[in-house]
């Protein structure tokens, strides 16, 4: 059950992650650039200690994961700045449900096995009812409706990330630590490229000089360094948990503690 502890650590760092841009209110793409390229460069030397993956499927997972991270990061950073960390983290909790059902769709034999247990079926019905009521309450205000429309891509991105992370950890040729290093270097580099592309796409009037000023000004550098540090811890805890958890949705469900941490830390 060590994955439960790792999952709770994941929830704690997710709370910090969500609170971050509520405080700094930086451009979400700029933070994504820092997180992506910063982590990738910091951990690149460790690639020397692990063999290069030979599986094309494994490289596809890493690249696909990077694109999902780019979607998730940018939406989460902008949402926490515009709507606050509390509402954002509470709505992201619905990812647990999406991840669980997506995993069962991909592994129907596990779902069929669970259906043989009446207690589990009743529990699922109660969970579905609870999520439905919570979702209905969240979307009653105009602010929540705007948040839902904006953050929904991040919900599906995080669900996909959770499943891809488990696959990356399970199919690693060099153990879980090799999986973590390749995740930190390759997937995060791809996410940095994603955010770089959308930065220039949305800031068309900005040239290279303005880009350098936005990324390396005093107001951005220290938050960027902090982001690199605790994001690496978040990814490590998440990968360790997802590798052994029977369903990625169970680990994502531990993100339900994130709104509590947000409330305490806010």
Task: List PLM regions with ranges.
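Hydrophobic transmembrane alpha-helices of multi-pass small-molecule transporters
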Residues: 18, 40-47, 73, 97-104, ...
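C-terminal ends of transmembrane helices
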Residues: 14-26, 70-89, 131-143, 196-210, ...
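Membrane-interface helix termini and inter-helical loops of multi-pass transporters
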Residues: 48-57, 107-116, 164-180, 206-214, ...
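Specific transmembrane alpha-helical segments of multi-pass solute transporters/efflux pumps
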Residues: 44-92, 98-102, 157-164, 221-247
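C-terminal transmembrane-helix exit sites in multi-pass transporters
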Residues: 50, 95-120, 240, 244, ...
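Glycine-/small-residue-enriched transmembrane alpha-helix faces in small-molecule transporters
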Residues: 1-30, 67, 71, 75, ...
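Hydrophobic transmembrane alpha-helices of multi-pass small-molecule transport proteins
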Residues: 38-43, 94, 98-105, 114-137
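Hydrophobic core positions of alpha-helical segments in small-molecule transporters
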Residues: 33-35, 64, 91-94, 122, ...
């Amino acid at each position: 059950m060590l994955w439960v502890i790792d999952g709770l650590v994941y929830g704690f760092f997710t709370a910090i992650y969500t609170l971050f841009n509520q405080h700094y209110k930086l451009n979400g793409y700029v933070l994504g650039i820092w997180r992506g390229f910063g982590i990738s460069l910091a951990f690149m030397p460790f690639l020397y200690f692990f063999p290069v993956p030979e599986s094309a499927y494994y490289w596809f997972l890493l690249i696909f994961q990077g694109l999902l991270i780019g979607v998730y990061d940018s939406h989460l950073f902008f949402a926490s700045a515009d709507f606050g960390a509390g509402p954002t983290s509470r709505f992201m909790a619905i990812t647990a449900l999406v991840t669980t059902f997506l995993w069962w769709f991909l592994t129907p034999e596990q779902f069929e096995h669970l259906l043989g247990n009446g207690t589990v079926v009743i529990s699922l019905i109660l969970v579905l009812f609870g999520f439905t009521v919570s979702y209905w309450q969240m979307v009653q205000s105009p602010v929540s409706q705007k948040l839902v429309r904006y953050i929904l891509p991040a919900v599906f991105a995080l669900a996909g990330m959770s499943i891809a992370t488990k696959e990356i950890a399970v199919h690693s040729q060099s153990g879980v630590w090799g999986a973590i290093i390749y995740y930190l270097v390759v997937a995060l580099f791809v996410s940095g490229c994603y955010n770089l592309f959308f930065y220039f796409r949305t800031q068309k009037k900005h040239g290279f000089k303005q880009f350098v000023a936005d990324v390396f000004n005093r107001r951005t550098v220290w938050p960027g360094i902090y982001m690199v540090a605790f994001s690496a811890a978040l990814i490590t805890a998440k990968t360790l948990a997802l590798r052994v958890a029977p369903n990625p949705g169970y680990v994502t469900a531990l993100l339900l503690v994130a709104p509590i941490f947000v409330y305490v830390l806010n």
